[in-house]
C-alpha cells in the first residue's frame, strides 16, 4: 500500500504552514524550495518563511480581525504563529517579530520534522499526479508561473508591492527622537518617534512628491496598480499635502516629552530584530530610487546621518482569479488533489497567506489519507477569508486582507459599541471553531 504523501512547492509562509499541518496529520511531505539556488528580487536568504516587507503581523487583540485570525490559527497549532510568538519584539498593540530569528525557527522546525523531506531545487512544472500544494508565492519563477497559466487557462493579475527601509539604530540621533507607543500601548515605549514641525513636514513633503521613482519599465506592467493596504509612502503623499498626517505620519496618541505637545507629524521606527540594532520605518514602503531614499529620508529629524541597512524595494506580485479556480478548501476546481495557497490566491498579508497554507495543508493531508477536504465555517475568520477569495466577482477580483466585513453579521439586536461588537464576532468565531474542530479535524483546539 502506498504511503500517504503530499508535495508542497514553496517554503514561504503559506508553504511552510501547509507542510507543517500535513506532517502533523501523519502524512509524509516533500517540501520544495528553490532558494538560495534560485533567488528573487526581494529575498535575501535561503530561510523558510522569510519576511520581505514589514516585520509586523499586525494587530493582536480580538477587537481586530487579524487578531482573531491569528488566534484561530494558534488554536489550530499553526507553526507560523508559534514561531512568531516565540520571536516577538516590542511593537505596542501589534505582533512583530525578529525577522531572521523567526525565519530560522520556522526553518529548523520543518527541516527537523521526521515526516518532512526538504528538497532545495526549483520546480518548473506542476507535478502531473499525487496530492500537491502550490504555495510558490507572488514571485513564482517564470517557468512555474507559465505552467500554472497553461493549467488554469487564465492570465494572472498583478499589482506592485513595496517594502520599507531598515536603519541601523546606532546611526539615529537619539537627542532628536523619543520613545513612546501610540496611546501607551504595549510596554508604552516600543517605538522610536521622529517628530516633525510644520515647516519640517512641508519641506519633507515637497521633497518626497518630487523624488525620482525606481518603477520597472516593462510595457506589460503599465496598468499594474498598488495594493491599497501597502501603498508606497510617496503614493500616499500624492493624494494631498495632509494625506501622510492622516496615514503613516499621523501624530495622534503621541506627546513629545520634551515639548509637552503633540508634534505636527511623526515618523515611527519599530524594532526589527531581537538584538534591537535594526529598526524599520513604519508605513514607509517605497518605490523611490535608493539614492533618493537616502536624500529624502535623511531630512527626517533624527535620521540626518542614518545608515540604511536595507533600502525600500518594489516588486511585482501576481495572483490568480481564485473565484474561478478554487474551492473554499483551497483545492483546484479542475483537478482533485491539487491545492493552491498563499498570496498567489489573492489574499493579502503575512497572516492571511499562512492561514491559506493552514487550510491547504490540512485538506491536502485529508486527500492523501482518502478523506474529503473540509470547508471552515463562515463564522470563523479563516472560513470567511477562504469564502471571499473563492466567491468574489472574478472580473473585479483584488487582493484582500481579513476584515470583519467579510464575516456574517451577528444575530439579534445590534451591539452599538464598535469594539464590543467586534469582540462579540470574535467570541462567536472561536466558539464555532471549538465546536466544529473535533468532529471535522479529529482533534480539539489548543488552549
From Swiss-Prot:
It catalyses: uridine(54) in tRNA + (6R)-5,10-methylene-5,6,7,8-tetrahydrofolate + NADH + H(+) = 5-methyluridine(54) in tRNA + (6S)-5,6,7,8-tetrahydrofolate + NAD(+); uridine(54) in tRNA + (6R)-5,10-methylene-5,6,7,8-tetrahydrofolate + NADPH + H(+) = 5-methyluridine(54) in tRNA + (6S)-5,6,7,8-tetrahydrofolate + NADP(+). Its EC number is 2.1.1.74. The keyword Ligase does not apply. GO terms for biological process: tRNA methylation; tRNA wobble uridine modification. It is an enzyme of class 2 (transferase). PROSITE patterns: GIDA_2. It is found in: Cytoplasm. Its cofactor is FAD. Catalyzes the folate-dependent formation of 5-methyl-uridine at position 54 (M-5-U54) in all tRNAs. This is Methylenetetrahydrofolate--tRNA-(uracil-5-)-methyltransferase TrmFO. It comes from Symbiobacterium thermophilum (strain DSM 24528 / JCM 14929 / IAM 14863 / T).
Amino acid at each position: 500500500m502506498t504511503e500517504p504523501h503530499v508535495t508542497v512547492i514553496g517554503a514561504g509562509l503559506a508553504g511552510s504552514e501547509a507542510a507543517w499541518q500535513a506532517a502533523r496529520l501523519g502524512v509524509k511531505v516533500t517540501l520544495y524550495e528553490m532558494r538560495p539556488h534560485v533567488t528573487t528580487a526581494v529575498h535575501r536568504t535561503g530561510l523558510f518563511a522569510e519576511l520581505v516587507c514589514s516585520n509586523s503581523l499586525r494587530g493582536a487583540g480580538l477587537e481586530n480581525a487579524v487578531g482573531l485570525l491569528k488566534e484561530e490559527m494558534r488554536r489550530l497549532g499553526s507553526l507560523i504563529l508559534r514561531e512568531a510568538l516565540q520571536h516577538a519584539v516590542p511593537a505596542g498593540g501589534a505582533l512583530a517579530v525578529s525577522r531572521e530569528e523567526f525565519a530560522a525557527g520556522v526553518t529548523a522546525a520543518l527541516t527537523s520534522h521526521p515526516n518532512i523531506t526538504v528538497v532545495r531545487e526549483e520546480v518548473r512544472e506542476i507535478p502531473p499526479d499525487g496530492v500537491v500544494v502550490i504555495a510558490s508565492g507572488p514571485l513564482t519563477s517564470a517557468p512555474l508561473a507559465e505552467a500554472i497559466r497553461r493549467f488554469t487557462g487564465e492570465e494572472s493579475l498583478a499589482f506592485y508591492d513595496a517594502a520599507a527601509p531598515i536603519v541601523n539604530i546606532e546611526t539615529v540621533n537619539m537627542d532628536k527622537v523619543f520613545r513612546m507607543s501610540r496611546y501607551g500601548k504595549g510596554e508604552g515605549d516600543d517605538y522610536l518617534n521622529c517628530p516633525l514641525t510644520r515647516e519640517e513636514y512641508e519641506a519633507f513633503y515637497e521633497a518626497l512628491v518630487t523624488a525620482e521613482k525606481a518603477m520597472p519599465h516593462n510595457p506589460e506592467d503599465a496598468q499594474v496598480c498598488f495594493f491599497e493596504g501597502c501603498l508606497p509612502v510617496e503614493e500616499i503623499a500624492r493624494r494631498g499635502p495632509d494625506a501622510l498626517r492622516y496615514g503613516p505620519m499621523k501624530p495622534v496618541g503621541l506627546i513629545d516629552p520634551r515639548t509637552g505637545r503633540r508634534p505636527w507629524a511623526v515618523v515611527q521606527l519599530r524594532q526589527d530584530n531581537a538584538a534591537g540594532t535594526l529598526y524599520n520605518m513604519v508605513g514607509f514602503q517605497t518605490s523611490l530610487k535608493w539614492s533618493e531614499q537616502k536624500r529624502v529620508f535623511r531630512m527626517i529629524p533624527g535620521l540626518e546621518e542614518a545608515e540604511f541597512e536595507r533600502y525600500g524595494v518594489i516588486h511585482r506580485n501576481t495572483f490568480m482569479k481564485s473565484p474561478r479556480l478554487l474551492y473554499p478548501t483551497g483545492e483546484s476546481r479542475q483537478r482533485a488533489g491539487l491545492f493552491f495557497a498563499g498570496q498567489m490566491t489573492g489574499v493579502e498579508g503575512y497572516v492571511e497567506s499562512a492561514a491559506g497554507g493552514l487550510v491547504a495543508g490540512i485538506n491536502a493531508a485529508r486527500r492523501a489519507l482518502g478523506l474529503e477536504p473540509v470547508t471552515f465555517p463562515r463564522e470563523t475568520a479563516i472560513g470567511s477569508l477562504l469564502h471571499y477569495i473563492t466567491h468574489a466577482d472574478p472580473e473585479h477580483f483584488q487582493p484582500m486582507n481579513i476584515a470583519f466585513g467579510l464575516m456574517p453579521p451577528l444575530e439579534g439586536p445590534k451591539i452599538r459599541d464598535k469594539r464590543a461588537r467586534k469582540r462579540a464576532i470574535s467570541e462567536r468565531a472561536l466558539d464555532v471553531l471549538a465546536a466544529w474542530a473535533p468532529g471535522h479535524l479529529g482533534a480539539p483546539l489548543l488552549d
